[in-house]
Swiss-Prot record:
It is found in: Cytoplasm. CDD domains: GMPK. The gene is gmk. One of its GO terms (molecular function) is ATP binding. Keywords: ATP-binding, Cytoplasm, Kinase, Nucleotide-binding, Transferase. This is Guanylate kinase. Pathway: Purine metabolism. It comes from the Bacteria. PROSITE patterns: GUANYLATE_KINASE_1, GUANYLATE_KINASE_2. Essential for recycling GMP and indirectly, cGMP. It holds the Pfam family Guanylate_kin. Residues 5-183 form the Guanylate kinase-like domain. InterPro entries: GK/Ca_channel_bsu, Guanylate_kin-like_dom, Guanylate_kinase, Guanylate_kinase_CS, P-loop_NTPase. It comes from Synechococcus sp. (strain CC9902). ATP binds at residues 12-19.
Amino acid sequence: MAHNGRLTVLTGPSGVGKGTLVKRLLDQHPEIWLSVSATTRQPRAGEEEGVSYFFHPRDTFDALVAAGGLLEWAEFASNCYGTPRDPVEEHLAAGRPVLLEIELEGARQVRTSFPDAFQVFLAPPSFAELERRIRGRGTDTEDAIQRRLARAREELNAQNEFDAVVVNDDLDQALKQLETHMQLQAP
């Protein structure tokens, strides 16, 4: 049984495997509610409004920020991303475990609003492996890869700010560690 109403924040650099790990976690623990972020970026193939993200034009996103409607937000790679506040608070009040998969600046903002949130940093086994994974995606220009790698160095330097660090070397082991940190029992 999950510890009801616990907020867990998962952060890590681009290419570390957050998406894969979260998908496995949700497959095994349907009681977890994964927050859906709002973004100003364009949808990618296969992404659905309200499932993958809430896609907003910049003026709508800025209005959400001004109204206090986002728990956290940041600009990354020329796009804005943020966590809508109301659904997070509603699910926590209903006693559900809530997971935020967000970037470093967002995690720092959540620390202010929800100091009891448990924050987990997902780290690669090495920087070389992270670079291999990012390049292996085949979706970015060399310029974009260099920006992601520079950002990853900054993020890796911040991992001591987190309550726990999980190294994503072996997916099954990383999943077990995340389940433990989230106070979940293996299915």
